Amino acid sequence: MTEAIFEPVIGRYLRLDLLGEPHRLYIEEAGQGIPLLCLHTAGSDSRQYRALLNDAELLKEYRVIAFDLPWHGKTSPPPGWQNREYKLTSQAYTDIIMTVCEALGLDQPVVMGCSIGGRIVLHLALEHASHFRAIIGLQSGAHVEPYYDLQWLHRPDVQGGETCAGIVSGLVGPAAPDDGRWETLWHYMQGGPGIFKGDLHFYTVDGDIRDRVAEINTELCPVYLLSGDYDYSCTADDTRALGRLIKGTEITIMPGVGHFPMSEDPDGFLQYLWPVLEKIRHAEARP
Protein backbone atom coordinates (compact mmCIF):
# COMPACT_ATOMS: atom_id res chain seq x y z
CA MET A 1 0.00 0.00 0.00
CA THR A 2 1.37 3.41 -1.01
CA GLU A 3 1.97 5.80 1.88
CA ALA A 4 -0.36 8.81 1.92
CA ILE A 5 1.49 12.10 2.31
CA PHE A 6 0.09 15.56 2.91
CA GLU A 7 1.81 18.38 1.06
CA PRO A 8 3.00 21.38 3.10
CA VAL A 9 0.60 23.67 1.22
CA ILE A 10 -2.27 25.21 3.17
CA GLY A 11 -5.30 26.43 1.21
CA ARG A 12 -7.84 28.79 2.77
CA TYR A 13 -10.54 31.26 1.83
CA LEU A 14 -10.05 34.88 2.82
CA ARG A 15 -13.24 36.91 3.15
CA LEU A 16 -12.63 40.53 2.19
CA ASP A 17 -13.98 43.35 0.07
CA LEU A 18 -12.32 43.78 -3.31
CA LEU A 19 -13.25 46.69 -5.56
CA GLY A 20 -16.17 47.48 -3.25
CA GLU A 21 -17.69 43.98 -3.37
CA PRO A 22 -17.51 40.99 -0.98
CA HIS A 23 -15.33 38.09 -2.10
CA ARG A 24 -14.11 34.70 -0.89
CA LEU A 25 -10.55 34.80 -2.17
CA TYR A 26 -8.81 31.44 -2.38
CA ILE A 27 -5.18 31.55 -1.17
CA GLU A 28 -2.51 28.86 -0.88
CA GLU A 29 0.74 29.26 1.01
CA ALA A 30 3.67 27.31 2.40
CA GLY A 31 7.03 28.02 3.99
CA GLN A 32 8.44 30.74 6.18
CA GLY A 33 10.61 33.79 5.80
CA ILE A 34 10.44 36.48 3.15
CA PRO A 35 6.95 36.67 1.59
CA LEU A 36 6.97 35.69 -2.09
CA LEU A 37 3.63 36.61 -3.64
CA CYS A 38 3.03 34.76 -6.93
CA LEU A 39 0.62 35.98 -9.62
CA HIS A 40 -0.81 33.58 -12.21
CA THR A 41 -1.25 34.09 -15.95
CA ALA A 42 -4.35 35.16 -17.87
CA GLY A 43 -7.17 32.63 -17.88
CA SER A 44 -5.49 30.31 -15.37
CA ASP A 45 -5.08 30.17 -11.59
CA SER A 46 -2.62 29.72 -8.75
CA ARG A 47 -2.12 25.99 -9.40
CA GLN A 48 0.61 27.13 -11.80
CA TYR A 49 2.83 27.64 -8.74
CA ARG A 50 2.27 24.16 -7.28
CA ALA A 51 5.93 23.18 -7.66
CA LEU A 52 7.23 26.30 -5.92
CA LEU A 53 4.79 25.74 -3.07
CA ASN A 54 6.28 22.26 -2.62
CA ASP A 55 9.99 23.00 -3.00
CA ALA A 56 11.57 22.15 0.37
CA GLU A 57 14.66 24.32 -0.07
CA LEU A 58 12.65 27.34 -1.21
CA LEU A 59 10.26 27.01 1.73
CA LYS A 60 13.12 27.28 4.22
CA GLU A 61 13.75 30.87 3.20
CA TYR A 62 10.51 32.10 1.63
CA ARG A 63 6.84 32.14 2.54
CA VAL A 64 5.37 31.35 -0.87
CA ILE A 65 1.85 32.71 -1.40
CA ALA A 66 -0.41 32.35 -4.43
CA PHE A 67 -4.04 33.36 -4.85
CA ASP A 68 -6.73 32.96 -7.47
CA LEU A 69 -7.88 36.27 -8.88
CA PRO A 70 -11.65 36.87 -8.68
CA TRP A 71 -13.42 34.89 -11.43
CA HIS A 72 -10.49 32.43 -11.55
CA GLY A 73 -9.89 28.97 -10.11
CA LYS A 74 -11.52 28.58 -6.69
CA THR A 75 -12.30 32.29 -6.29
CA SER A 76 -15.85 32.76 -7.52
CA PRO A 77 -16.99 35.99 -9.17
CA PRO A 78 -18.97 38.46 -7.05
CA PRO A 79 -22.77 38.21 -6.81
CA GLY A 80 -24.50 39.37 -9.97
CA TRP A 81 -21.69 38.24 -12.24
CA GLN A 82 -24.21 36.83 -14.70
CA ASN A 83 -25.34 40.34 -15.59
CA ARG A 84 -21.94 41.78 -16.48
CA GLU A 85 -18.98 41.27 -18.79
CA TYR A 86 -15.65 40.51 -17.15
CA LYS A 87 -12.84 42.88 -18.15
CA LEU A 88 -9.64 43.18 -16.14
CA THR A 89 -8.17 46.68 -15.88
CA SER A 90 -4.79 47.83 -14.58
CA GLN A 91 -6.39 49.84 -11.77
CA ALA A 92 -8.57 46.94 -10.61
CA TYR A 93 -5.67 44.50 -10.83
CA THR A 94 -3.40 46.78 -8.82
CA ASP A 95 -6.08 47.42 -6.20
CA ILE A 96 -6.70 43.68 -5.74
CA ILE A 97 -3.00 42.94 -5.18
CA MET A 98 -2.47 45.81 -2.76
CA THR A 99 -5.62 44.88 -0.82
CA VAL A 100 -4.44 41.27 -0.51
CA CYS A 101 -0.99 42.40 0.67
CA GLU A 102 -2.59 44.57 3.34
CA ALA A 103 -5.06 41.89 4.44
CA LEU A 104 -2.24 39.35 4.86
CA GLY A 105 0.00 41.86 6.61
CA LEU A 106 2.85 41.28 4.18
CA ASP A 107 5.93 43.30 5.08
CA GLN A 108 7.96 44.21 1.99
CA PRO A 109 7.10 41.08 0.01
CA VAL A 110 8.74 40.01 -3.20
CA VAL A 111 6.07 39.91 -5.90
CA MET A 112 6.49 37.65 -8.91
CA GLY A 113 4.05 37.49 -11.81
CA CYS A 114 3.94 35.80 -15.20
CA SER A 115 2.37 37.11 -18.43
CA ILE A 116 -0.40 39.43 -17.22
CA GLY A 117 1.24 39.02 -13.82
CA GLY A 118 4.53 39.98 -15.43
CA ARG A 119 2.88 43.13 -16.76
CA ILE A 120 1.15 44.18 -13.55
CA VAL A 121 4.38 43.92 -11.53
CA LEU A 122 5.70 46.75 -13.71
CA HIS A 123 2.73 48.86 -12.63
CA LEU A 124 3.49 47.94 -9.00
CA ALA A 125 7.15 48.91 -9.38
CA LEU A 126 6.10 52.25 -10.82
CA GLU A 127 3.24 53.11 -8.47
CA HIS A 128 3.98 51.23 -5.22
CA ALA A 129 7.76 50.73 -5.17
CA SER A 130 8.14 51.33 -1.44
CA HIS A 131 5.81 48.44 -0.59
CA PHE A 132 7.94 45.72 -2.21
CA ARG A 133 11.35 44.25 -1.52
CA ALA A 134 11.78 43.34 -5.19
CA ILE A 135 9.83 42.71 -8.39
CA ILE A 136 10.26 39.57 -10.51
CA GLY A 137 8.66 39.64 -13.95
CA LEU A 138 8.27 36.39 -15.87
CA GLN A 139 7.57 36.82 -19.57
CA SER A 140 7.26 40.56 -18.97
CA GLY A 141 6.65 43.04 -21.74
CA ALA A 142 5.37 46.59 -21.71
CA HIS A 143 2.75 45.86 -24.38
CA VAL A 144 1.65 43.23 -26.87
CA GLU A 145 -0.45 43.58 -29.99
CA PRO A 146 -3.25 40.99 -30.34
CA TYR A 147 -1.99 38.27 -32.66
CA TYR A 148 -5.33 36.48 -33.07
CA ASP A 149 -9.02 37.38 -32.99
CA LEU A 150 -9.93 37.49 -29.29
CA GLN A 151 -13.61 36.94 -30.12
CA TRP A 152 -12.86 33.23 -30.57
CA LEU A 153 -12.25 33.02 -26.82
CA HIS A 154 -15.92 33.57 -25.95
CA ARG A 155 -18.44 32.37 -28.52
CA PRO A 156 -21.55 30.23 -28.04
CA ASP A 157 -20.62 28.02 -30.99
CA VAL A 158 -17.07 27.23 -29.80
CA GLN A 159 -15.93 25.05 -26.87
CA GLY A 160 -14.28 27.73 -24.76
CA GLY A 161 -11.89 25.70 -22.60
CA GLU A 162 -10.42 23.66 -25.40
CA THR A 163 -10.09 26.78 -27.56
CA CYS A 164 -8.19 28.64 -24.82
CA ALA A 165 -5.88 25.68 -24.29
CA GLY A 166 -5.38 25.28 -28.03
CA ILE A 167 -4.40 28.91 -28.45
CA VAL A 168 -1.77 28.82 -25.68
CA SER A 169 -0.48 25.33 -26.50
CA GLY A 170 2.03 26.78 -28.94
CA LEU A 171 3.50 28.92 -26.17
CA VAL A 172 4.78 25.94 -24.17
CA GLY A 173 8.48 25.24 -24.71
CA PRO A 174 9.32 22.19 -26.85
CA ALA A 175 11.49 20.66 -24.14
CA ALA A 176 8.83 20.89 -21.43
CA PRO A 177 8.05 17.54 -19.77
CA ASP A 178 4.72 16.08 -20.85
CA ASP A 179 3.24 16.24 -17.35
CA GLY A 180 4.09 19.94 -17.01
CA ARG A 181 2.83 20.73 -20.51
CA TRP A 182 -0.52 19.02 -20.08
CA GLU A 183 -1.14 20.24 -16.55
CA THR A 184 -0.57 23.80 -17.78
CA LEU A 185 -3.08 23.29 -20.60
CA TRP A 186 -5.59 21.60 -18.27
CA HIS A 187 -5.78 24.77 -16.18
CA TYR A 188 -6.79 26.68 -19.32
CA MET A 189 -9.41 24.10 -20.24
CA GLN A 190 -11.08 24.73 -16.87
CA GLY A 191 -11.33 28.52 -17.06
CA GLY A 192 -14.71 30.23 -16.79
CA PRO A 193 -16.45 31.48 -19.95
CA GLY A 194 -14.98 34.75 -21.18
CA ILE A 195 -12.36 35.00 -18.43
CA PHE A 196 -9.29 34.53 -20.63
CA LYS A 197 -10.68 37.10 -23.04
CA GLY A 198 -11.36 39.53 -20.18
CA ASP A 199 -7.82 39.16 -18.86
CA LEU A 200 -6.43 39.88 -22.30
CA HIS A 201 -8.25 43.22 -22.26
CA PHE A 202 -5.67 44.22 -19.65
CA TYR A 203 -2.82 42.50 -21.51
CA THR A 204 -3.48 44.00 -24.94
CA VAL A 205 -5.28 47.30 -24.23
CA ASP A 206 -5.62 48.72 -20.73
CA GLY A 207 -2.28 47.58 -19.31
CA ASP A 208 -0.11 49.22 -21.98
CA ILE A 209 2.73 50.79 -20.02
CA ARG A 210 5.22 51.53 -22.80
CA ASP A 211 5.24 55.28 -22.18
CA ARG A 212 5.85 54.93 -18.43
CA VAL A 213 8.25 52.06 -17.75
CA ALA A 214 11.33 54.27 -18.04
CA GLU A 215 10.13 56.04 -14.88
CA ILE A 216 10.63 52.89 -12.77
CA ASN A 217 13.37 53.45 -10.20
CA THR A 218 15.19 50.19 -9.48
CA GLU A 219 17.04 51.82 -6.58
CA LEU A 220 13.68 52.05 -4.82
CA CYS A 221 12.53 48.61 -5.94
CA PRO A 222 14.89 46.17 -7.72
CA VAL A 223 13.45 44.63 -10.90
CA TYR A 224 14.42 41.20 -12.22
CA LEU A 225 13.15 39.91 -15.56
CA LEU A 226 13.25 36.21 -16.47
CA SER A 227 11.98 35.20 -19.90
CA GLY A 228 11.95 32.00 -21.90
CA ASP A 229 13.06 32.46 -25.48
CA TYR A 230 10.36 30.13 -26.88
CA ASP A 231 7.50 32.59 -26.62
CA TYR A 232 5.87 34.63 -29.35
CA SER A 233 3.57 36.41 -26.89
CA CYS A 234 6.50 37.98 -25.04
CA THR A 235 9.70 37.35 -26.94
CA ALA A 236 13.18 37.51 -25.48
CA ASP A 237 13.70 40.65 -27.57
CA ASP A 238 10.60 42.19 -25.97
CA THR A 239 12.12 41.58 -22.55
CA ARG A 240 15.50 42.93 -23.61
CA ALA A 241 13.79 46.05 -24.97
CA LEU A 242 12.00 46.46 -21.65
CA GLY A 243 15.28 46.09 -19.80
CA ARG A 244 16.85 48.85 -21.87
CA LEU A 245 14.05 51.19 -20.78
CA ILE A 246 14.29 50.38 -17.07
CA LYS A 247 17.71 51.43 -15.81
CA GLY A 248 19.28 48.88 -13.47
CA THR A 249 17.09 45.94 -14.43
CA GLU A 250 18.66 42.48 -14.33
CA ILE A 251 17.63 40.16 -17.19
CA THR A 252 17.86 36.38 -17.50
CA ILE A 253 16.91 34.67 -20.76
CA MET A 254 15.99 30.99 -20.35
CA PRO A 255 16.79 28.96 -23.49
CA GLY A 256 14.04 26.64 -24.73
CA VAL A 257 11.55 27.78 -22.08
CA GLY A 258 8.09 28.94 -23.08
CA HIS A 259 5.46 31.29 -21.71
CA PHE A 260 4.72 29.32 -18.52
CA PRO A 261 8.12 28.58 -16.94
CA MET A 262 6.86 27.89 -13.41
CA SER A 263 4.33 25.25 -14.52
CA GLU A 264 5.57 23.83 -17.82
CA ASP A 265 9.04 22.95 -16.47
CA PRO A 266 9.27 23.88 -12.79
CA ASP A 267 12.53 22.03 -12.11
CA GLY A 268 14.25 23.79 -14.99
CA PHE A 269 12.75 27.13 -13.99
CA LEU A 270 13.98 26.88 -10.40
CA GLN A 271 17.57 26.68 -11.64
CA TYR A 272 17.14 30.19 -13.06
CA LEU A 273 14.99 31.55 -10.23
CA TRP A 274 17.20 30.48 -7.32
CA PRO A 275 20.11 32.86 -8.05
CA VAL A 276 17.66 35.76 -8.18
CA LEU A 277 15.98 34.79 -4.92
CA GLU A 278 19.34 34.35 -3.22
CA LYS A 279 20.43 37.81 -4.35
CA ILE A 280 17.18 39.27 -3.00
CA ARG A 281 17.51 37.37 0.28
CA HIS A 282 21.03 38.60 0.94
CA ALA A 283 20.22 42.20 0.04
CA GLU A 284 19.58 44.46 2.99
CA ALA A 285 15.89 45.19 3.44
CA ARG A 286 14.93 48.82 2.96
CA PRO A 287 13.60 50.66 6.02
Regions picked out by a protein language model, each given a short descriptive name:
Residues 1-37, 59-63, 106-107, 274-287:
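Alpha/beta-hydrolase fold catalytic core
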Residues 19, 23-79:
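Conserved HGGG/HGGXW glycine-rich cap/lid loop of the alpha/beta-hydrolase fold
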Residues 20, 65-112, 271:
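Active-site loop/oxyanion-hole signature of alpha/beta-hydrolase fold enzymes
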Residues 122-127, 131-163:
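Flexible "cap/lid" loop of the alpha/beta hydrolase fold
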Residues 146-147, 160-218:
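Conserved alpha/beta-hydrolase catalytic His-Asp/Glu region
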Residues 219, 225-227:
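Short beta-strand/loop motif that positions the catalytic acidic residue
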Residues 229-234:
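Acidic catalytic loop of the alpha/beta-hydrolase fold
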Residues 249-287:
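Catalytic active-site module of serine/aspartate enzymes centered on a nucleophile-bearing elbow/loop
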